[in-house]
Amino acid sequence: EGPFGDHLGYYSLQHDFPLMKVHKVYARKNAIWAFTVVGRPPQEDTSFGQLIHSMTGAAVSNEIPGLKAVHAVDAAGVHPLLLAIGSERYTPYLQTQKPAEILTIANHILGTGQLSLAKFLWITAEDTSAKFKLDTHKEQAFFAYMLARMDFSRDLHFYTNTTIDTLDYSGENLNSGSKLVLAAYGEVKRILAAIVPDSIQNLNQVEVVNSISP
């Protein structure tokens, strides 16, 4: 089968897949959606992603202990990018805060059903002392919160030679490749720049630099 257009807007390669014979196709009269279209977001996955979030949002914490929220980002094709908020209860008596429990939660997420198709998982812990409530659906604020606290020598966790989405061709073989978990928690380590520094603007190799966040 293949090549065919996939849910991320690309074309898959040819592979051997099970043969399915279709004898009848049923359709509801006056259907709201007579058909769906796959391709770059927002397409089919957008609507289904929103529906799944509304149906399963409250049940996620019951399925995965310690998990407060998880959001599949539509702009990334829904399942390739997950943003999650967990709990940090392992060492509350220590002054130094660092990822611990959220690492076990990350493993649970990547081992659960369709969540296992994620390519990138950003996860932090609920912060009750923060002036605002962290929300996985407010993507820009979520990224800014994590990047301000991330230790890049410690908080990048690569999963190599593992199972990945069939439509992910970044690996060496079909269904085999890598994933990345970014787990950050604790005190602020840096203040993110709101403007592009002059040191970057004046580089010979760079012509136009714009800041999109924060």
Label the model's feature ranges.
Residues E1-P214:
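Charged, compositionally biased interaction regions
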